[in-house]
């Protein structure tokens, strides 16, 4: 199935130096992938030339005159950057010219712009950011990772539905398990929002595992972990910090003496395999679930390999009909939008 992905070629810390090599590698590996590079035409053409590439049937340029800065406010991006590479890429999804959009740009601006242009699916009050984390059993999808600091029980139910349908489509699991992140596994634990969300999830048609604790995330206890954006973002950043610390400790210990250096040399194949399993680039690409279009956010500091994974994630979501599955499940659950809680669009 042919898929067309619009790429914000100017977004992120490194812009076209990362996005264009990633796009070229992505279309080489996926014969059914088409890419639209959105941004300043002269800059994109120069980067293509540097990579000994040109436009063609599967790769074309869509000119945009403006760029959203990484520190620009969502309000400024919406009001003052109507011809930004970010917004034009999202507009291509709205018009149907592209089936998905990928950007490494400013998260707040991307969420606000995507919400403004694409709107939310019927039954979804507010989009959520879903990301992938490695586990002992494979990987887990976690949401929300920062879009909604405060949530109602109904919002958490919506997140669970979206996350479950994403996993069902992309991982080809018929009934993925859903866990509600809490301070204990017992039903009586947690604040009122989490308790009420648990009741809604138990009454839903989802495969609800129950409450899970932080240590369950990396055990792979469930396929989906649901929480509000405040908790999710703290958990994510804590995990990133821990991974960096472990990596630094390993390097320090192996450099301690000639004997430890020799041990490091002997252990190199194992260490490489270990590093690959935990390589954050393999899990790059957070999905903005709940919109009337596929939007994937790459880490701003991503290199070309990491950005390529984000492109692949967007293509897989489009190819496997994630939006249709979410819409169908929302209708089954008879959900209606609830009052919005504070999120990135209200910042």
Swiss-Prot record:
Substrates-to-products reaction catalysed: a fatty acyl-[ACP] + phosphate = an acyl phosphate + holo-[ACP]
Alphabetical list of InterPro entries matching this protein: FA_synthesis, Phospholipid_synth_PlsX-like
A cellular component term, taken from the record's GO annotations: cytoplasm
Residue stretches in coiled coil: none
Compartment(s): Cytoplasm
Entry keywords, A to Z: Cytoplasm, Lipid biosynthesis, Lipid metabolism, Phospholipid biosynthesis, Phospholipid metabolism, Transferase
EC numbers: 2.3.1.274
Pfam families tied to this protein: FA_synthesis (PF02504)
NCBIfam families, per database record: plsX (TIGR00182)
Known partners and oligomeric status: Homodimer. Probably interacts with PlsY.
Function, as annotated: Catalyzes the reversible formation of acyl-phosphate (acyl-PO(4)) from acyl-[acyl-carrier-protein] (acyl-ACP). This enzyme utilizes acyl-ACP as fatty acyl donor, but not acyl-CoA.
Protein's recorded name: Phosphate acyltransferase
Species of the source: Methylobacillus flagellatus (strain ATCC 51484 / DSM 6875 / VKM B-1610 / KT)
Lineage: Bacteria, Pseudomonadati, Pseudomonadota, Betaproteobacteria, Nitrosomonadales
């Amino acid at each position: 199935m042919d898929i067309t992905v619009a790429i914000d070629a100017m977004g992120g810390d490194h812009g076209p130096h990362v996005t264009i090599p990633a796009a070229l590698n992505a279309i080489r590996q996926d014969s059914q992938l088409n890419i639209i590079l959105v941004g300043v035409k002269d800059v994109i053409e120069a980067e293509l030339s540097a990579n000994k590439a040109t436009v063609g049937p599967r790769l074309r340029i869509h000119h945009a005159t403006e760029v959203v800065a990484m520190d620009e406010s969502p309000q400024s991006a919406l009001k003052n950057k109507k011809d930004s590479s970010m917004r034009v890429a999202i507009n291509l999804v709205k018009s149907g010219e592209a089936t998905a959009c990928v950007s490494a740009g400013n998260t707040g601006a991307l969420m606000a712009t995507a919400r403004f242009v694409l709107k939310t699916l019927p039954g979804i009050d507010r989009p959520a950011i879903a990301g992938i984390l490695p586990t002992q059993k494979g990987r887990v999808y976690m949401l929300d990772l920062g879009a909604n600091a405060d949530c109602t029980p109904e919002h958490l139910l919506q997140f669970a539905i979206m996350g479950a349908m994403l996993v069902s489509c992309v991982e080809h699991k018929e009934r993925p398990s859903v866990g509600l992140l809490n301070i204990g596994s017992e039903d009586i634990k947690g604040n009122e929002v989490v308790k009420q969300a648990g009741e809604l999830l138990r009454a839903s048609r989802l495969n609800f595992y129950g409450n899970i604790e932080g240590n369950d995330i990396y055990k792979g206890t469930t396929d989906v972990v649901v929480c509000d954006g405040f908790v999710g973002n703290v958990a994510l950043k804590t995990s990133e910090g821990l991974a960096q610390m472990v990596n630094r400790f390993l390097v320090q210990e192996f450099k301690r003496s000639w004997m430890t250096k020799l041990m490091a040399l002997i252990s190199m194949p194992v260490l490489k395999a270990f590093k690959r399993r935990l390589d954050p680039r393999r899990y790059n690409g957070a999905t903005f679930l709940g919109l009337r279009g596929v939007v994937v956010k790459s880490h701003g500091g991503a290199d070309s390999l990491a950005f390529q994974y984000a492109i692949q994630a967007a293509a897989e979501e489009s190819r496997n009909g994630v939006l249709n599955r979410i819409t169908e499940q929302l209708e089954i659950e008879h959900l209606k939008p609830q009052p919005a809680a504070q999120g990135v669009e209200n910042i």
